A protein has these predicted regions:
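Aromatic- and Gly/Pro-rich donor/ligand-binding loops
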Residues: 1-147
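Mid-sequence, gly/pro-rich, charge-dense loop/helix-turn segments that line enzyme active sites
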Residues: 150
Length: 150
């Protein structure tokens, strides 16, 4: 007997959903740049099969409530987080909220494509301010997954 996996994935929209250009911009389905949409779509398409159901959660969620974690635990088998340049100054508050959420879920968490963003000539010591946030995020994920995709 084949069982169906129910997956919750961070992303702007399902690649199966038909939306207009105006809806895409108005609802920020790009996640502020088209690379986010392309990356999330590729993860979705890789996982999509007759044995998976994938719900796309959007980008604007505030992931840190106990109720949200309880709902995820009750309804899903896996949480997929396609990230690109999440280790950057303006994303750290959201990364910290994801850490809180991940610490509350009991299902496997898969992170793909995460990395740091900095200017080509920047002093990497300028990234030290986020070390604690990045470390806590990675610890939370690795308690629920064997690895983190970079």
């Amino acid at each position: 007997m084949v069982t169906t996996q129910k997956i919750l994935m961070r992303g702007g929209k399902s690649p199966l959903a038909r939306v207009t250009y105006d809806e895409t911009l108005r609802n920020n389905l790009l996640g502020t740049n088209s690379g986010n949409l392309i990356f999330a779509d590729s993860v979705f398409r890789t996982l999509y099969s007759k044995n998976t159901t994938i719900d796309v959660a959007g980008y604007s969620a505030k992931p840190n409530t106990k109720e949200q974690a309880e709902k995820i635990n009750a309804e899903y088998d896996m949480l997929i987080l396609p990230f690109a340049n999440a280790f950057r100054k303006d994303f750290i508050p959201l990364l910290d909220r994801f850490t809180k959420l991940i610490n509350q879920v009991k299902i496997p968490v898969v992170v793909t494509g995460i990395g740091a963003q900095a200017a080509i000539n920047s002093d990497l010591s300028e990234l030290d301010f986020m070390k604690d946030s990045v470390t806590e995020f990675c610890k939370a994920v690795l308690q629920r997954s064997a690895s983190i995709g970079v």
